[in-house]
UniProtKB/Swiss-Prot annotation:
It catalyses: (6R)-5,10-methylene-5,6,7,8-tetrahydrofolate + NADP(+) = (6R)-5,10-methenyltetrahydrofolate + NADPH; (6R)-5,10-methenyltetrahydrofolate + H2O = (6R)-10-formyltetrahydrofolate + H(+). Pfam families: THF_DHG_CYH (PF00763), THF_DHG_CYH_C (PF02882). Catalyzes the oxidation of 5,10-methylenetetrahydrofolate to 5,10-methenyltetrahydrofolate and then the hydrolysis of 5,10-methenyltetrahydrofolate to 10-formyltetrahydrofolate. The gene is folD. This is Bifunctional protein FolD. It comes from Buchnera aphidicola subsp. Acyrthosiphon pisum (strain APS) (Acyrthosiphon pisum symbiotic bacterium). Keywords: Amino-acid biosynthesis, Histidine biosynthesis, Hydrolase, Methionine biosynthesis, Multifunctional enzyme, NADP, One-carbon metabolism, Oxidoreductase, Purine biosynthesis.
Amino acid sequence: MPAIIIDGNKIAKKIELKILKKVKQRKKNGERIPGLAMILVGNHIPSQIYVNKKKISCKNVGFFSECWNLPSNINEKEILNIISKLNENKNIDGILIQLPLPPQINHMKILSSIVPDKDVDGFHPYNTGSLCQRTPKLRACTPKGIITMLKYNKIKTHGLHAVMVGASNIVGRPMSLELLLAGCTTTVTHRFTKNLKDHVQNADLLIVAVGKANFLKGSWIKTGSIVIDVGINRLKNGKVVGDVEFKTAYLRASYITPVPGGVGPMTVATLLQNTLEACENHDDI
């Protein structure tokens, strides 16, 4: 039997409607609306597209947003000065650094300069460490969004053998911590992993984030497994595909995310959730 498609667009819209309702209530109560500042360095076209999507999403849920478009030859000190001002700005609840940054910029130094309670991307060492200690604060958007997708589909994760293919700081590593928190027995594979196929075939829950089109063969997937494809890859013919060979995987999995329309919308929706959460936390200070 073909897999059930996990519709990220549908879930993201439900989340955004809930956020909009809360923002309207805040305005009705005379409270401040959430504010998000985005920093974009250089002319990286995909990054510009992502930032524009986030600006539109902020507008749709009633947030205030601003974007700092900075030249690619900017130095670290200038970016740090901007972040310092945003850290002190009481109208800004979240600060987002659109990655990647130019090679002359130390991205960890930049990310670590954001105060943790405004780190709505969840990349600050404090927030990563809090997740590791099982006391999550602001959590990385894509991994948190994936957990939300599973919950919306009433997929029970406790006791599942989860295999994370990819070990990036943005997805793979924080996702492995989320999976542990969700009660999974978790395996993380990476570019040095031997016999990847063997690991994949043993996965009850498979999450793939390597950034290579159709990298993982659908025939490797265990019948009845849950497949989450994080990859977004554009082929020469313009078609957008994931990291998993979808047609074959669809016939073997019990649940699967499409590309596009799966994980992507959830990442943005989770960013909005984090920004609202940060705003509410700032109210309590």
